[in-house]
């Protein structure tokens, strides 16, 4: 059985996750605008919930796009 290496979270445990911090939220979405899963980012369950809620709020307020634009 192989031991999996735990990924380091890009945010600290005590760091406040805010919907206005677009630079932080962009670390947790793909180029297509999808929210990255917890196993890919290495955050805790509580942090993942806060991140998802903040991204959804930022989308509603037009701070983040719902989907990426297709620029050819």
UniProtKB/Swiss-Prot annotation:
Gene (name only): rps18
PANTHER family per record: 30S RIBOSOMAL PROTEIN S18, SMALL RIBOSOMAL SUBUNIT PROTEIN BS18M
UniProt-recorded name of the protein: Small ribosomal subunit protein bS18c
GO biological process, one term: translation
A Pfam cross-reference name: Ribosomal_S18
Organism: Trieres chinensis (Marine centric diatom)
Subcellular localization: Plastid, Chloroplast
UniProt keyword Transport, yes or no: no
One term under GO cellular component: chloroplast
Family: Belongs to the bacterial ribosomal protein bS18 family.
Record note on quaternary structure: Part of the 30S ribosomal subunit.
The entry's keywords: Chloroplast, Plastid, Ribonucleoprotein, Ribosomal protein, RNA-binding, rRNA-binding
Gene Ontology molecular functions: small ribosomal subunit rRNA binding; structural constituent of ribosome
